[in-house]
Amino acid sequence: VNENFEEKINSCVWSAGREKYAELIRQVKAAFRNIYQYAFAIEQKCAMIYRFTEQALDEIDFACLFNSEKKLLAIGINTRENKQSVNCYDMLCSEARLTSLTAIALGKIPAEHWFKLTRPFTRLYDLPLCLSWSGTMFEYLMPDIFIKPSENSMLYTSASIAVKAQEEFQSKSGIWGISESAFHAFDYSREYKYRAFGVPAIAVSTFKAEKIFSPYSCLLALEYAPQECMQNIVRLVEHGMTGSYGMYEAIDFKHCESNGGPGIVYSHMAHHAGMSLCALTNCLYSQALRKAFSSRSFVAAVSVLLEEK
């Protein structure tokens, strides 16, 4: 906390005006004092969080999730039977590759795991594209928040093509951007239902195309198509997609056709808002999160994996 801030405030006010503006000066001083105290408290909390995450990083154990036979990470643990799920994350173009990279970098799982991840290829726009399971923006771009593949690499090219495919898969009003999200249908407890939506042209799985667009999906693509993303955000705002906590979860052009227009999913999901804020931070503050993550020595050891052609 700057102990001299009151003197600095006094020096900014000419002596003749101090009496006249005494109350205003008092309020300004009090406000600055509160700001300094609040900033100091935040700094202390950040230091505590840093120590906690450092310890967690050292102690995290991937052995319970690593299938030593398949050399893949299981999607979870059956806690009743204390067994790994038989299903594994087995595709390179997946949000799970961030976990794969981190676990390899920390020496928690062998590097050969990376090469066990499948790379199903197709051609789109006369370019090679590595497919994802559901054709979502999330699968291609979420890992980019922390570590972005080298330009002209296979992952970078695939992400660029995926963004273009997502742009073309749009509503009549030009809205685009699809990932897993809530949609305009309700479960027995009157909560919005939730599942993955994607673009069929970039997906391995087969499904009926449904146009449910989520703002976070668009924001993840900011660095690949900044102008198109901002135009898309403007369209979302024009469709009433802003609330007290930012943009609403999604706009559903599929399940509300009988009502004569799209349905807004009036909810906010913390992890989607978090991804949006992270993507905006990287875009506006010179890739701050990416630089912070990449500055760790263990990350540098695996960056070569992202140069795959």
Task: Show where each model-derived region lies.
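Ser/Thr/Asn(+Pro)-rich, low-complexity disordered segments
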Residues: 1-309
